[in-house]
């Protein structure tokens, strides 16, 4: 096969993957439907990102730049299209952001021509003046928020080496990077979030609260370990262009022998419904094989986004089947979801909800539900009783109820 024929065969194979129709799994749990195929893998990335198509310079048609994974994607519906800002990880371990677009949200995702060029973070003097920039070694896990101030915000983790531990090449620090855009192509980088501790899991609430920007935070002592950090926090910010956490309180706590014993964090920004705010979060616990990441849900009051009104016990979504396998095993993580039908800022009960999650830090998937089903799940699923005895009592109550039904 000559060089041009090899390219033609490569393009045909790639198009077959991009055009593959996705279908729901035959059986589910009634809460949501998972789909048969991942929506994005490393192989979905454009061939032009990976191959040099010059026969002179690349006679063997080798991949010159290899892509390792597509994961942890922010999501939004824009101009009738379903857009993901994907964390793409190269073989060199560096992550970057790229937009992938779908006409229906469940398949036919295609990346835009080029990755996002994210500007460096401005450095501020004590007087608040910009005096330079600081380039992070790695950036990843963007949460997208279309804010009522008219901007699209992307909040993400900015990782740098911890120079206070010069001899430890694995020592790192995490800060919250902040950028905003009008078109997802040109981004304005704002100064990183200023906080008293490390912040790698921060989400912007879509509305002003008491005239201020509101953040869901995750205070932690180290890059990985939460230490004294108690869970999902809440902070109000006066000026997003000079964002600083001055006061912070925990609104969703970690607890012993639960799915969020080690740490927990907000996923995407919550969805506003007439019943309250729907929240999707991740919880982490330790087990024999390492850290297990799962997704869980909770709801807060419509007039008080910090007041929890419902929280089902246990996990909402976990890795299953082939989802267990990947770079970091036994992980489900989500930082993007989309409610299809929004009226006056509120997702209607009949609205489809697309939940975008990554499995094992390797590939992207979608699960679909509706606002009505997710609200029902949150409001009517038993809470965690925190003791085996309570769990057994809950099951026996349901058994007794079902015995009295003619089904």
Model-derived regions, located:
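Beta-rich carbohydrate-recognition and catalytic domains
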Residues: 1-72, 76-137, 145-203, 207-262, ...
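Donor nucleotide-activated moiety binding/catalytic core segment of transferases
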Residues: 259-267, 330-333
């Amino acid at each position: 096969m000559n060089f041009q024929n090899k390219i033609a065969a490569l393009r045909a194979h790639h198009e077959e993957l991009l055009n593959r129709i996705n279908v729901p799994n035959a059986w589910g749990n009634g809460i949501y439907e998972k789909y048969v195929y991942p929506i994005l893998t490393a192989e979905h990335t454009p061939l032009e990102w990976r191959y040099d198509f010059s026969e002179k310079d690349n006679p063997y048609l080798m991949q010159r730049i290899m892509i390792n994974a597509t994961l942890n994607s922010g999501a939004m519906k824009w101009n009738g299209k379903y857009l993901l800002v994907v964390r793409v990880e190269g073989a060199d371990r560096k992550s970057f952001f790229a937009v992938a677009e779908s006409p229906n949200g469940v398949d036919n995702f295609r990346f835009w021509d080029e990755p996002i060029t994210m500007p460096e973070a401005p450095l501020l003097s004590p007087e608040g003046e910009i005096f330079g920039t600081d380039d992070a070694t790695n950036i990843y896990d963007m949460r997208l928020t279309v804010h009522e101030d008219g901007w699209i915000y992307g909040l993400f983790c900015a990782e740098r080496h911890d120079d206070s531990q010069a001899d430890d090449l694995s020592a790192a620090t995490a800060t919250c990077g902040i950028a905003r855009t009008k078109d997802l192509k040109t981004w304005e980088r704002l100064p990183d979030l200023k906080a008293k501790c490390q912040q790698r899991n921060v989400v912007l609430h879509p509305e002003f609260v008491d005239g201020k920007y509101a953040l869901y935070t995750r205070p932690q002592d180290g890059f990985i370990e939460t230490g004294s950090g108690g869970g999902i926090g809440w902070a109000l910010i006066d000026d997003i262009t000079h964002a600083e956490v001055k006061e912070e309180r925990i609104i969703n706590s970690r607890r012993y022998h639960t799915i969020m014993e080690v740490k927990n964090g907000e996923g995407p920004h919550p969805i506003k419904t007439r019943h309250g705010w729907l929240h999707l979060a991740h919880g982490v616990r330790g087990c024999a094989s390492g850290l297990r990441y799962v997704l869980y849900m909770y709801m807060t009051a419509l007039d008080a986004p910090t007041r929890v009104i419902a929280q089902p016990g246990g996990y909402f979504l976990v890795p299953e089947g082939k989802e267990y396998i990947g770079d970091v095993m036994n992980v489900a993580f989500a930082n993007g979801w989309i409610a299809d039908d929004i009226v006056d800022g509120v997702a209607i009960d009949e609205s489809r909800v697309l939940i975008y999650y990554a499995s094992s830090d390797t590939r992207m998937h979608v699960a679909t539900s509706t606002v009505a089903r997710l609200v029902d799940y949150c409001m009517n699923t038993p809470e965690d009783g925190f003791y085996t005895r309570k769990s057994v009592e809950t099951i026996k109550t349901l058994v007794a109820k079902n015995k009295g039904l003619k089904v």
